[in-house]
Regions:
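Cell-envelope/extracellular polymer assembly enzymes that use nucleotide-activated donors
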Residues: 1-3, 33
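Short, well-formed alpha-helical segments that are part of the catalytic scaffolds
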Residues: 10-26
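A conserved acidic beta->alpha catalytic loop
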Residues: 34-46
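Short, structured coil segments at secondary-structure junctions
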Residues: 50-53
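Glycine-rich, basic loop-to-helix element that forms the pyrophosphate-binding segment
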Residues: 59-74
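Acidic donor-binding/catalytic loop of UDP-sugar-dependent glycosyltransferases
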Residues: 68, 82-99
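Short aromatic/hydrophobic "clamp" motif used to bind/position activated sugar donors
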Residues: 79
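Catalytic-site signature of metal-activated, phosphate-bearing donor transferases
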Residues: 95-176
């Protein structure tokens, strides 16, 4: 099982796409719980959390501090951090479940293969995917899944990250 945390900074139209993509994983029992995290009170995030049945957490600080605070309240042994507007696709549910079960107690993490938004530049996604393959370091735009204890103590950002073959689609608005 995995918990999902989605940092929300402002009104994020792509957040609804991200949540919709997670519904099958919730129904299948892969996703145990989901929380939206914001650094300040956010009416949009509160409304979405209320309508979708997910939790909301307001905690100050940078992204790493928000992930750590989220890890402290979530219940699953693994956490998937997604940016609003990023949509896991393909066979991601099976692939991430297999990765978690194969990882055992090893401190490993995984991230998706980033697919650019239609009409957007393709160089940045290619560079991010290349960097992940060569250095084992993921960008937040690739969705990071790591053990909850590694998210809680901040070490998830230092783990070697395996790249999943499942894509994560960029559905964010063109201005981002």
């Amino acid at each position: 099982m995995i918990s999902v945390v989605i940092p929300v900074a402002q009104e994020e139209p792509g957040l609804l796409d991200t949540l919709a993509a997670l519904v099958p994983a919730v129904a299948d029992g892969l996703v145990r719980d989901l929380v939206l995290v914001s650094s300040a009170p956010n009416r949009f995030a509160e409304d979405v959390a209320d309508a979708s049945g997910c939790g909301i957490l307001v905690t100050p600080g940078a992204r790493a501090a928000q992930l750590a605070a989220s890890a402290a309240v979530l219940r699953a042994p693994w956490i998937l951090a997604l940016e609003p507007g990023l949509v896991p696709a393909g066979g991601w549910m099976d692939e991430i479940a297999d990765f978690m079960s194969d990882s055992g107690q090893a401190q490993r993490a995984c991230a998706f293969t980033l697919v650019p938004r239609a009409g957007a530049g393709r160089m940045r996604p290619r560079l991010l995917n290349w960097r992940l393959g060569v250095t084992g370091r993921a960008d937040p735009l690739q969705g990071l899944a790591a053990p909850a204890d590694a998210m809680a103590d901040g070490s998830a950002l230092r783990l070697r990250v395996a790249r999943l073959t499942s894509p994560i689609l960029d559905r964010r608005s063109a201005g981002r």
